[in-house]
Amino acid sequence: MSNNPQLNKSGQLQHLLTTEGLPASILLNILDTAEPFVGVTERDVKKVPLLRGKSIFNLFFEPSTRTRTTFEIAAKRLSADVINLNIAASSQSKGETLLDTVNNLSAMHADMFVVRHAQSGAAHLIAQHVRSDIHVINAGDGRHAHPTQALLDMFTIRRCKRDFHNLRVAIVGDILHSRVARSQIHALTTLGVPEVRVIAPKTLLPAKVERLGVHVYHDMAKGLKDVDVLMMLRLQNERMLSARLPSTEEYFKYYGLTPEKLALAKPDAIVLHPGPMNRGVEIDSVVADGKQSVILPQVTFGIAVRMAVMSILAGS
């Protein structure tokens, strides 16, 4: 029996809560399963019947555009029934607890919950209390994790670079407040990337981040040298409890990705960004819209990856 709360007694994926602690075999299975779904998204009839009759509830307690929309599209392309809970109009606004909300929705014969919440651990809490036939996907919880974003990033990297084992990857920006960065680091190291770098000012790095197996840089010129993949992160101003930077202009001067800084990486380096982008803060428009950017393909691949996660969970 597995001690991982994401796995069932047979070692199959029961919930997707974080990339941390998941074996490479499960991560690779998700990436492999996503491959044929890319073709589905390119067809005239963008639908397969794998989740016909299943009810998927999207519970987004934080604002979202890409994640919520791509989860909804992914579920509908799998032929599931999708219910988007309007949090502002729900009983949550009247003081109902998170678990009471989930228990009531479970009584409506939900099959899967996709959850985004400002509190770290919210998806784990739900997973601990739902029936064994219900699956939970963490769509982002506080500063903790965003596993499907990391997985679609891994899918994008593999599509462009084929092999994880010879890559030098740099994650640049607000590492301290980023759930994406944590999920990316766990996925990259699990999949065998030999060198993962984080580049940020000291005020935007977690304490003892080196324990995650990353190399820390405070200087873009050194950190970007010979890098294959650049993963840019926005400043999470909504999670900052105090001022950590003199100004966004100063941040862009030292840490914004410009064509000049990108030239320090390998000539065929690719640039990723989970969105939303703040042009002129963490990335220059010339780079964001340039030939080395794979930011829009990330969004497209996100649908296929989320289809893969849902279909695997439904099959477990």
UniProtKB/Swiss-Prot annotation:
GO biological process terms on file: 'de novo' pyrimidine nucleobase biosynthetic process; 'de novo' UMP biosynthetic process; amino acid metabolic process
Pfam families recorded: OTCace, OTCace_N
Class of enzymatic activity (EC top level): transferase
Residues reported in the UniProt entry to bind carbamoyl phosphate: 66-67, 116, 146, 149, 275-276
SUPFAM superfamilies reported in the protein's UniProt record: Aspartate/ornithine carbamoyltransferase (SSF53671)
Gene Ontology cellular component annotations, sorted alphabetically: cytosol
Reaction(s) the record says it catalyses: carbamoyl phosphate + L-aspartate = N-carbamoyl-L-aspartate + phosphate + H(+)
Molecular function (Gene Ontology), one example: aspartate carbamoyltransferase activity
EC number, UniProt record: 2.1.3.2
Keyword S-adenosyl-L-methionine found: no
Keywords linked to the UniProt accession: Pyrimidine biosynthesis, Transferase
Superkingdom of source: Bacteria
Family note: Belongs to the aspartate/ornithine carbamoyltransferase superfamily. ATCase family.
Pathway: Pyrimidine metabolism; UMP biosynthesis via de novo pathway; (S)-dihydroorotate from bicarbonate: step 2/3
Binding site for L-aspartate: 94, 179, 234
Gene that this sequence comes from: pyrB
Name of the protein described by the UniProt record: Aspartate carbamoyltransferase catalytic subunit
Reported function: Catalyzes the condensation of carbamoyl phosphate and aspartate to form carbamoyl aspartate and inorganic phosphate, the committed step in the de novo pyrimidine nucleotide biosynthesis pathway.
